[in-house]
Amino acid sequence: MTDRYTIHSQLEHLQSKYIGTGHADTTKWEWLVNQHRDSYCSYMGHFDLLNYFAIAENESKARVRFNLMEKMLQPSGPPADKPEEN
């Protein structure tokens, strides 16, 4: 019984500490945005992968990095409208 409580409290701690871990009310759109932003950050952080993208797109590394940062603003487009509950 104590293991279940410990795991639950650890999960709550992680969810409050880190943005991308989600919570019970996380929507599909929020989860997708977190995944895309995580991927773009990883691409920018790995020098060889950034070089690969720059060569494949025939752009400079700075331009590729700028484009990735621009994509991070709204990687999945605007959020879907929620239906109104009456």
Swiss-Prot record:
* Pfam families from the UniProt entry: SF3b10
Q: Which GO terms describe its molecular function?
A: RNA binding; splicing factor binding
Residues that the record marks as modified (N6-acetyllysine) are: 17
Q: Please list the residues that carry the modification Phosphoserine.
A: 9
Tell me, which GO biological process terms does this entry list? Answer: mRNA splicing, via spliceosome; positive regulation of DNA-templated transcription; regulation of DNA repair; regulation of RNA splicing
Q: Which InterPro entries match?
A: SF3b5/RDS3-10, Splicing_factor_3B_subunit_5
Q: What is its main location?
A: nucleus
**One GO cellular component term:** nucleoplasm
Q: Which PANTHER family match?
A: SPLICING FACTOR 3B SUBUNIT 5
Name-wise, this protein is Splicing factor 3B subunit 5
Q: Which organism does this record belong to?
A: Mus musculus
Point out the gene that encodes the protein. Sf3b5
